[in-house]
């Protein structure tokens, strides 16, 4: 089944800024969105892993989606993370996002309850039938302990009209190769791991859902644009420049490092919600994170 690709290029997996007293910092969120669009991104992803989805209340979800749609103002598609390990809840979140005006949905493989491949397929089919909006599957087995098998993703792409792509964060090149070799027309295959973006593009992929773009939208968009234009020499150069910072984003649990970088830039507080905790200001890990970005942008290393 052919699809209309939701985007091609970079979609930042946006952090959710919080104030020091744990409220949503809508002003910082809107500034972040403007910076991303000015940097050249092709879409926005809100309420994903990097957006601390598990600790966001239902009311806050509405506020975040409304703020993202208002700030984007039609300039790029807004994709909302609505997948959970509860199908009914995922349906409710998906319908609410579509009703608010979301352009697409990000549906993660169910975590903790570890369904069969058939169970996951039924989960997605149920969401798609209820929400009737483009769906990007999200495969991140390191977080969920569940791997979306290529044959399952391809079955859904062929049989379910709204399944329009996959964010692949398994790190499995063979799996990515299978998806790219057998996908239907218009089915997007995106890197969900910044460090894997260059190889995915070289294999014919369509872009990335990115963590590092929160702080470096322009340089990361240059990498992806070069790869999509088959200018692999330029893409390799950008990859080499960004690689230390890409790796630094995962020296502690995402989004802790990237939020600290954004805070060092003066864009937001470094606050994350429990059970995540911010890095200690004097920790060696924090120094390594900020130092990795210091060659690329002017961050304050305390």
Swiss-Prot record:
The keyword Amino-acid biosynthesis applies. It catalyses: L-aspartate 4-semialdehyde + pyruvate = (2S,4S)-4-hydroxy-2,3,4,5-tetrahydrodipicolinate + H2O + H(+). One of its GO terms (molecular function) is 4-hydroxy-tetrahydrodipicolinate synthase activity. It holds the Pfam family DHDPS. InterPro entries: Aldolase_TIM, DapA, DapA-like, Schiff_base-form_aldolases_AS, Schiff_base-form_aldolases_CS. It is an enzyme of class 4 (lyase). One of its GO terms (cellular component) is cytosol. The active site is at 138 (proton donor/acceptor), 167 (schiff-base intermediate with substrate). GO terms for biological process: diaminopimelate biosynthetic process; lysine biosynthetic process via diaminopimelate. The record marks 49, 112 as: Part of a proton relay during catalysis. It is found in: Cytoplasm. Homotetramer; dimer of dimers. Belongs to the DapA family. NCBIfam families: dapA (TIGR00674). This is 4-hydroxy-tetrahydrodipicolinate synthase. It comes from Salinibacter ruber (strain DSM 13855 / M31).
């Amino acid at each position: 089944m052919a699809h209309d690709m939701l985007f091609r290029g970079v979609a930042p997996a946006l952090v959710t800024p919080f104030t020091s007293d744990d409220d949503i910092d809508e002003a910082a969120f809107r500034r972040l969105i403007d910076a991303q669009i000015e940097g050249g991104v092709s879409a926005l992803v809100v309420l994903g892993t990097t957006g601390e989805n598990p600790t966001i209340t239902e009311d806050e979800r509405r506020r975040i989606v409304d703020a993202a749609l208002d700030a984007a103002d039609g300039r790029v598609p807004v994709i909302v993370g609505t997948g959970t390990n509860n199908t009914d809840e995922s349906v409710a979140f998906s319908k609410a996002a579509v009703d608010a005006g979301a352009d697409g949905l990000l549906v993660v493989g169910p975590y903790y309850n570890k369904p069969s491949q058939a169970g996951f397929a039924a989960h997605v089919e149920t969401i798609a039938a209820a929400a009737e909006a483009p769906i990007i599957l999200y495969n991140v087995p390191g977080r969920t302990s569940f791997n979306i098998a290529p044959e399952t993703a391809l079955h859904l792409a062929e049989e379910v009209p709204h399944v329009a792509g996959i964010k692949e964060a398994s790190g499995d090149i063979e799996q990515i190769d299978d998806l790219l070799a057998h996908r239907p027309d218009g089915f997007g295959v995106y890197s969900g791991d910044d460090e894997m973006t260059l190889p995915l593009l070289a294999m014919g992929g369509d872009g990335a859902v990115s963590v590092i773009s929160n702080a470096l939208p322009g340089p990361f968009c240059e990498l992806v644009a070069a790869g999509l234009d088959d200018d692999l020499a330029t893409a390799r150069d950008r990859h080499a420049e960004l690689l230390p910072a890409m790796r630094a984003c995962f020296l502690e649990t995402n989004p802790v490092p990237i939020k600290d970088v954004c805070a060092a830039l003066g864009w937001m507080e470094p606050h994350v919600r429990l059970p995540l905790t911010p890095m200690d200001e004097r920790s060696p890990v924090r120094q390594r994170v900020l130092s990795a970005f210091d060659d690329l942008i002017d961050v304050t290393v305390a």
